[in-house]
């Protein structure tokens, strides 16, 4: 991620748009084709070099940016201006990462969960904040878990944040608002967060050492019944 240089538009017409990922236009492209007659929008990925991991900007942040750009009436400069780098500084060693989310922050929490599992950088446990009272709070009493909390500033958020510090080793608070742009920025924060956790554990998110079964399952086409 390179701050305001993360995404740029290099070509634009009524039916076609080409987006560049990072500062190297020759490396990654995401092209959008619009079929107005049939109401179909196609996203086509072009990558110069074969990616070594399923974890990539092309598969996560950029599609979200395309959709966000649509809902912002093609005000892509607003997306660029709002994108920035985020720094973290905490001990990442723990038994599990407890992720506190809700309907408004599902995209970011799903990214965290899948990336932690796929890259092998931590064990994620997803909590719906509104269901946390139903026995799930028992897990936090292990005292060696790290909480990642998506904070919208509600009364429930204030209550949970005041309590979690008593039971968790660390509470990482990611502030957000119930808006599309804010949810996009929350996803960016989570990308920097996973990058930090991976670096502390000396893992490479761009070159995950997958179990051999991964490719077998990825190409599996037989029956499941």
Label each PLM-derived region with a short phrase.
Residues 1-84, 143-146, 150-176:
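Glycine-rich phosphate-binding loops that contact phosphosugars or nucleotide phosphates
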Residues 20-22, 31-34, 39-42, 107-109, ...:
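Small-side-chain structural scaffolding
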Residues 23, 128-129, 176, 210:
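Proline- and acidic/polar-enriched loop/turn elements at helix boundaries
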Residues 47-144, 219-225:
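Active-site phosphate/pyrophosphate-binding segments
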Residues 107-108, 156, 181-185:
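Secondary-structure boundary/capping motif
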Residues 141-148, 190, 194:
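Short basic, glycine-rich beta-strand/loop surfaces that mediate nucleic-acid
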Residues 165-225:
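Phosphate-moiety recognition in structured ligand-binding domains
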């Amino acid at each position: 991620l390179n701050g305001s240089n993360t995404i740029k538009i290099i070509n634009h017409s009524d039916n076609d748009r080409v987006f560049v990922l990072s500062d190297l236009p020759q490396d990654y492209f995401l092209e959008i084709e619009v079929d107005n007659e049939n109401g179909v929008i196609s996203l086509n990925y072009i990558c110069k070099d074969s990616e070594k991991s399923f974890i990539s900007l092309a598969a996560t942040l950029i599609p979200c940016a395309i959709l966000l750009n649509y809902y912002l009436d093609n005000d892509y400069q607003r997306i660029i201006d709002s994108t920035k780098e985020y720094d973290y500084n905490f001990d990442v060693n723990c038994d599990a990462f407890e992720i506190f989310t809700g309907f408004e922050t599902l995209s970011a929490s799903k990214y965290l969960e899948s990336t932690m599992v796929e890259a092998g950088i931590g064990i994620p446990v997803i909590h719906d904040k509104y269901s946390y009272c139903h026995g799930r709070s028992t897990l936090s009493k292990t005292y060696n878990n790290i909480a990642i909390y998506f904070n919208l500033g509600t009364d429930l958020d204030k209550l949970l944040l005041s309590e979690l510090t008593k039971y968790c080793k660390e509470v990482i608070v990611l502030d957000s608002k119930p808006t599309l742009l804010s949810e996009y920025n929350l996803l960016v924060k989570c990308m920097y967060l996973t990058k930090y956790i991976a670096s502390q554990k000396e893992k490479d998110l761009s070159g995950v050492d997958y179990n051999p079964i991964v490719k077998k399952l990825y190409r599996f086409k037989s029956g499941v019944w």
